[in-house]
Amino acid sequence: MTFTELSTDLLADPVALLMSSFFTASNSSKAAGQAYIERLKLRVTDRDAPVSMMAAGAQLAAIREWGSISSADRYATLPRIHQRILIVHGSKDIVVIPINAFLLAQHLPDAQLVMYPDASHGAQSQHAEVFLQHARLFLDG
């Protein structure tokens, strides 16, 4: 399934949408998704504001604009970024397909790509413990 193939029924149910777009259909991924949902419920103070429809629309517009730029132009300025960058991605991401993470890593001179197996758009939540290890190694390096 791709992100654009998600049904309108899922769009009406935020938890179902999150589970379908951030986690895969495997039992281990579904279990990680449920654990993530439970972790979200634990924090009751100092929570981020929910994403507004306006913010979601602006993000989709930015994605569309990025996609309308020719491939050559899309990556032209990335080699000028010399900041260390950690790219975290799921091997089965349906929101941003994995090849895009590889392309990004190829065009950024100091990027490190970590691809998590059997993970969709919520790779860092599905593999939370190992992600924290990778993040610490990156930040300490």
Outline where the language-model segments fall:
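Short beta-strand/loop motif that positions the catalytic acidic residue
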Residues: I81, I87-H89, D93
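Flexible "cap/lid" loop of the alpha/beta hydrolase fold
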Residues: M1-D13
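Active-site acidic short loop of glycosyltransferases
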Residues: H82-Q83, D110
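Catalytic active-site module of serine/aspartate enzymes centered on a nucleophile-bearing elbow/loop
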Residues: F102, L108-G141
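The feature captures the conserved acid-bearing segment of alpha/beta-hydrolase catalytic domains
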Residues: A72-R80
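Conserved alpha/beta-hydrolase catalytic His-Asp/Glu region
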Residues: A16-A61, G67, S71
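Conserved alpha/beta-hydrolase "acid-adjacent" motif
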Residues: I94-N100
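Alpha-helical elements of Rossmann-like donor-binding domains used by nucleotide-donor carbohydrate transfer enzymes
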Residues: L17, R39, A58-A62, A76, ...
